[in-house]
């Protein structure tokens, strides 16, 4: 059986060796060059390939059409991936006749993603293992062929556990490779209800928070100990690394981080204490804990810190253009509640943000982005993060005022992007679910779905294309000039303060606000083309929490990423939305103060939106990136969002004094 192997690290060596021993014909091995910044403690797949006269390649992008063609020419029966660090595209996965299989270092479906070896130790797990599974477009989600569990003892660290997993992998492959060759394997689908995801770990993850329990910190130490970068803290301004530690019972009422004794070196934690058995200072060598304490000049009662004392952390300055808008005002509320951010905002109105005006961390200027260009450039230079939230985003305006949409949504935002490039400021840019256009995928994926729009004479696409081009410009600036950016794509966010009823009166609002106005005024609810179009509605609180995590950007893992933010479980047609809204309206305490329901009326899109409109039948997001990068998933059901949105708008209507 002919195989093409994607492999790296010790697990790659184990996999290649197992295939050789099992009698597979290896047509090619694709691997990575060793990175100068990475401590190379593991075996070389390339060396094994050379010793066995197997062609070996190190492409920059294995998913490039040229490499896909080369792999196709090899006509593999089977593909194996052993700790290869790049996801393989569907075009590659579909090449082998038997299938493509991946070796993963956990007991799937738990701990999908990167670095499961370290994560299981961080989380104090007592068992892990290895899994050979069929590869699918979703990482680590395919059916399982074989697994082997590995016990984790308190004496295990990342390196000893890594060696155990390599041994387990060799055993799994020895058993299952003949069955794959003879095509007599049984496969078990993964249980999605217990799936979990973990992200890539960086050296920053080794920073010690002494407020955590000692057991948690001991797990962190063993999870990232040598040859990984290590768990670290600071004594004054000097960094030191802890290589080995153990929990010590402690009932003393001491502040976390306090040195309780020097030899042994024992430090108070959130509960119990941590004894440092070995470690080293930043400029020192590996040494015993007591000697490390002397080298650092520690005394009993000294206080250790997660960061050097000499560095004063100021609040992060965030510039929000369009701060009075739906997303802007809700985001401002979340950032101010956190307390670590200072907000600078610009908008042409203040109705939604008046509640923030007394907050000393909120600075507002009333103005237009097309006029206040100097103020904007100055504050881009001054701030750390820029969110340009100004845009015309109501469908009727795409056909009513297409040039204004282009001028504001594209031209003005392009100026802001270029200022961010000039001053090297991080930009978090609101893309849109509209960029997917008429994509036929069942779910829209940020990295793989095609962006399909209609003909030029359908002017409604000017918004989608303007946003898409800005997405591409940002991506190019990131690739060519190092711009730090994140694109987020909201999918039908709803909630209080979404537009206003006055905007709805002139047709310039989103769907739910327009529907509420119809109920308030007793006019027909117009369902464009029968309201059959399906959308996935997302509560504003869910959306803002995801956006807040993008701003936090832990581990910088949102840099250069595109992230859908939506709720695929809240899919409903516009007609269903209207029916749910009507039911909520009928049971509302203020219902009696409004006219009778006038009924639904189906209208053609051309009569409602005008010439040049074209609709989209469905729009459902993949939120794989949001789960993986943010640890986020939506939780608010659509019925709750509808109730809260309706109540907010009904409370804004002027009613007779008795009703008030």
Curated annotation (Swiss-Prot):
Which GO MF terms does the UniProt record name? carboxy-lyase activity; UDP-4-amino-4-deoxy-L-arabinose formyltransferase activity; UDP-glucuronate dehydrogenase activity
Q: Which pathway does this polypeptide act in? A: Nucleotide-sugar biosynthesis; UDP-4-deoxy-4-formamido-beta-L-arabinose biosynthesis; UDP-4-deoxy-4-formamido-beta-L-arabinose from UDP-alpha-D-glucuronate: step 1/3; Nucleotide-sugar biosynthesis; UDP-4-deoxy-4-formamido-beta-L-arabinose biosynthesis; UDP-4-deoxy-4-formamido-beta-L-arabinose from UDP-alpha-D-glucuronate: step 3/3; Bacterial outer membrane biogenesis; lipopolysaccharide biosynthesis
Q: Where is this region: Dehydrogenase ArnADH?
A: 314-660
UniProt keyword annotation of Oxidoreductase present:
yes
Family of this protein: In the N-terminal section; belongs to the Fmt family. UDP-L-Ara4N formyltransferase subfamily. In the C-terminal section; belongs to the NAD(P)-dependent epimerase/dehydratase family. UDP-glucuronic acid decarboxylase subfamily.
Q: What is this protein called?
A: Bifunctional polymyxin resistance protein ArnA
InterPro entries associated with the record: Arna-like_SDR_e, Bifun_polymyxin_resist_ArnA, Epimerase_deHydtase, Formyl_trans_C, Formyl_transf_N, Formyl_transf_N_sf, Formyl_transferase-like_C_sf, Lipid_A_modif_metabolic_enz
Q: Does the keyword Oxidoreductase apply?
A: yes
């Amino acid at each position: 059986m002919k195989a093409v192997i994607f492999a790296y690290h010790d697990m790659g060596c184990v996999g290649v060796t197992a295939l050789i021993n099992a009698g597979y014909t290896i047509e090619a091995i694709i691997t990575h060059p060793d990175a100068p910044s990475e401590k190379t403690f593991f075996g070389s797949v390339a060396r094994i390939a050379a010793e066995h006269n197997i062609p070996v390649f190190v492409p920059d992008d294995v998913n490039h059409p040229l490499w896909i063609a080369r792999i196709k020419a090899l006509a593999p029966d089977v593909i194996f991936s052993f700790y290869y660090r790049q996801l393989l595209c569907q075009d590659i996965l579909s090449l082998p006749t038997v299938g493509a299989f991946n070796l993963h270092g956990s007991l799937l479906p738990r701990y999908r993603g990167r670095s499961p070896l370290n994560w299981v130790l961080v989380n104090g797990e007592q068992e892990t293992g290895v899994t050979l599974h069929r590869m699918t477009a979703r990482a680590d989600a395919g059916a399982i062929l074989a697994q082997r569990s590995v016990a984790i003892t308190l004496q295990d660290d990342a390196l000893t556990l890594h060696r155990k997993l390599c041994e387990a992998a060799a055993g799994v492959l020895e058993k299952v490779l003949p069955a794959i060759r003879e095509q007599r394997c049984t496969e078990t689908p993964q249980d999605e209800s217990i799936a979990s995801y973990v992200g890539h770990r960086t050296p920053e993850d080794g920073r010690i928070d002494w407020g955590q329990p000692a057991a948690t910190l001991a797990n962190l130490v063993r999870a990232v100990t040598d040859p990984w970068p290590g768990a670290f803290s600071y004594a004054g301004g000097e960094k030191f690394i802890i290589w080995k530690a153990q929990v010590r019972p402690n009932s003393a009422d001491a502040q976390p981080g306090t040195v309780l004794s020097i030899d042994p070196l024992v430090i108070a934690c959130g509960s119990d204490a941590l004894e440092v058995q070995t470690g080293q200072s930043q400029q020192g060598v590996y040494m015993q804990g007591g000697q490390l304490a002397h080298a650092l000049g520690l005394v009993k009662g000294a206080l250790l810190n997660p960061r050097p004392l000499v560095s004063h952390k100021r609040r992060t300055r965030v510039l929000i253009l369009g701060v009075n808008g739906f997303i802007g005002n809700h985001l401002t509320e979340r950032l101010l509640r956190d307390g670590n951010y200072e907000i600078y905002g610009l908008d042409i109105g203040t109705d939604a943000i008046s509640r923030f005006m007394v907050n000393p961390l909120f600075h507002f200027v009333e103005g237009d982005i097309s006029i206040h260009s100097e103020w904007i450039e100055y504050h881009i230079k001054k701030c750390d993060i820029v969110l340009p939230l100004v845009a015309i985003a109501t469908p009727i305006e795409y056909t009513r005022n297409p040039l204004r949409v282009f001028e504001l949504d594209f031209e003005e935002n392009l100026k802001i992007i270029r200022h961010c490039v000039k001053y090297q400021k991080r930009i978090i840019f609101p893309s849109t679910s509209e960029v997917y256009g008429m994509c036929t995928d069942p779910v829209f994926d940020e990295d793989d779905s095609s962006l399909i729009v209609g003909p030029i004479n359908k002017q409604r696409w000017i918004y989608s294309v303007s946003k898409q081009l800005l997405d591409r410009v940002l991506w190019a600036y990131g690739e060519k000039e190092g711009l730090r950016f994140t694109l987020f794509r909201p999918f039908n966010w709803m909630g209080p303060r979404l537009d206003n009823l006055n905007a709805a009166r002139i047709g310039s609002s989103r769907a739910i606000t327009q529907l509420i106005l119809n109920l308030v005024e007793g006019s027909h609810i117009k369902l464009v083309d029968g309201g059959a179009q399906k959308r996935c509605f997302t509560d504003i609180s869910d959306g803002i929490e995801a956006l807040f995590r993008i701003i936090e950007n832990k581990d910088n893992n949102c840099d250069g990423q595109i992230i859908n933010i939506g709720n695929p479980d809240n899919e409903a047609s516009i007609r269903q939305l209207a029916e749910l809204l009507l039911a909520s309206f009928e049971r509302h305490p203020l219902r009696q103060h409004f006219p009778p329901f006038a009924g639904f009326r189906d209208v053609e899109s051309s009569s409602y939106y005008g010439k040049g409109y074209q609709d989209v039948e469905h729009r459902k997001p993949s939120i794989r990136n949001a789960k993986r990068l943010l640890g986020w998933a939506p939780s608010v059901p659509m019925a709750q969002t509808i109730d809260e949105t309706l109540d907010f708008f009904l409370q804004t209507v002027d009613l007779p004094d008795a009703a008030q």
